Amino acid sequence: MTTPAGSGTGFGSVSWWGLSPAVDLQAESPPVDPDSQAETEHETPELNVLLLGSVDGRHLLRTLARAALWPRRRFHFYVLENNLEAVARHILIFSLALEDPEKMGLQERSETFLEVWGNALLRPPVAAFVRAQAGRLAHLVPEPDRLAEQLPWLSLGALKFRERDALEAVFRFWAGGEKGPEAFPMSRLWDSRLRQYLGSRYDARHGVSDWDLHMKLHDRGARVIHTREFRRWRDTGVAFELRDSSAYHVPNRTLASGRLLSHRGERVAARGYWGDIATGPFVAFGIEADDETLLRTSNGQPVKTACEITEHNVAELFREMAAWGHPRAAEGDPEQVQGGAEGSSEPAAPAPEPFTVHFLSLDSAHTLHHKSCYMGQFQLLYVACGMVHLLSAELGACVAPGGRLIVELAQFLVDLRQEQLQAFSSRVGELAQAAGFAPQLGGKPSDTFARFYKAGDSAPGHEDPAVESGTPPPEVLAPPLEATDPPSEDRTQPLESGNPPSEPLKLTSESQASLLEASVPPTGSQAPKSENQTVPPETKYPIP
């Protein structure tokens, strides 16, 4: 609901980046069982991980980059999102991370990743890369044989046929299926969303952003985010300005999503930006670093900004992933990766085991336990803060005995007060206990993640005191971030394909607010009839 002081919903209803630092999933998972390892002496142990709402692949990338530090394991990542645009971004990001180094150097890959992942506006060369990759992926998705040959790490077998068709439509839109800037006027949509969020505080938006940064994000552990970069992102949506500001003017279509809105009793298909405008993409790679010198301070101020730390961390991430990007290793054929220059006498490092990313059907969290292939299958379950409401006993049954659960907390959501954060942590503990998990014992306290193990087994030696017992206030008995998974009738498949659902569509307060930032709905089977479903003027032309 929009008030004179703003809507207070800066996180939005669609997640494009995570609100927690990237973690190594091997460090969070239980160690390999020596008995099972002895039984499979000649086979590589497997690690099966189920991730709900990880949105940007940061945990998967860090896990692959750190794989050389652990005993060899074959990874199976099962990813469940609440919208197909997030699935498409996963695929695009991994395609970029595994790009042949001879085609794209390390620095170019790192900069392209940062802009596509976290900027609302792109440089023309980066936009051209997105169009080319999206066009390639649009041709691969409907052809399973070619997809398996060119992207052997990707599995779309669990998606429904209509979801694959919709995924193809997403890639075609990214590839420029609808020409012209009006197809997705990002700058106008961003400003409209900002006005709706801030209300009467819009003219004092710099003061609001400074307050949110210094009194909330800095106090919660993100002190390296600089005022200048945070203001720039809040104003324009450009988080990582790696070139002159004038170079960023092409809308980033990977941040577009479609929704069905109700207008005068009719369903209207609209495309807009409904992502985060409050916290920003700085947390995932920009507030922690393996190199402690990046986090040092001088006169009480950090010497590096979150943007600089993110650049360094992503470059190191892609450098460590070079073995995964080796052509033969990426095709699932482990071999020796040549070390050093040609003719080097150093022994070659073994190629890593192949990995597979399995994308599950949307809304399948409540039905996974019906399939025997998922029962007790996963050693680790990861749940993002916006998907906590999906945590249930049925989902817990899919975790193997002794398995672990890691839940992202709402630490970096600036719209939540401290008492709401504590209530949310308590609610997470209750849901985890009801799902059959118990808090881990010992370990360093964390306000960012809550960690549990599958109850009924010996307690491992880690605990996250961030999860406390107690009854939360009534207003937070339901997870406050449930808006990140909008009801199925309020969410639409990509606008180029499919038909609106036959059920009546209820317009939530989030949907009412979203009318201000939606752009002109495209023509096609989902486009409404002009005489009955005309989009209101503020939808066609958001507030300038």
Swiss-Prot record:
<comment type="function">
    <text>Required for the assembly of axonemal inner and outer dynein arms. Involved in preassembly of dyneins into complexes before their transport into cilia.</text>
</comment>
<feature type="region of interest" description="Disordered">
    <location>
        <begin position="328"/>
        <end position="350"/>
    </location>
</feature>
<dbReference type="InterPro" id="IPR039304">
    <property type="entry name" value="DNAAF3"/>
</dbReference>
<dbReference type="InterPro" id="IPR028235">
    <property type="entry name" value="DNAAF3_C"/>
</dbReference>
<dbReference type="Pfam" id="PF14740">
    <property type="entry name" value="DUF4471"/>
</dbReference>
<keyword id="KW-0970">Cilium biogenesis/degradation</keyword>
<dbReference type="GO" id="GO:0044458">
    <property type="term" value="P:motile cilium assembly"/>
</dbReference>
<keyword id="KW-0963">Cytoplasm</keyword>
<protein>
    <recommendedName>
        <fullName>Dynein axonemal assembly factor 3</fullName>
    </recommendedName>
</protein>
<feature type="region of interest" description="Disordered">
    <location>
        <begin position="448"/>
        <end position="544"/>
    </location>
</feature>
<dbReference type="InterPro" id="IPR027974">
    <property type="entry name" value="DUF4470"/>
</dbReference>
<dbReference type="Pfam" id="PF14737">
    <property type="entry name" value="DUF4470"/>
</dbReference>
<dbReference type="GO" id="GO:0070286">
    <property type="term" value="P:axonemal dynein complex assembly"/>
</dbReference>
<dbReference type="GO" id="GO:0120293">
    <property type="term" value="C:dynein axonemal particle"/>
</dbReference>
<comment type="similarity">
    <text>Belongs to the DNAAF3 family.</text>
</comment>
<feature type="compositionally biased region" description="Polar residues">
    <location>
        <begin position="522"/>
        <end position="536"/>
    </location>
</feature>
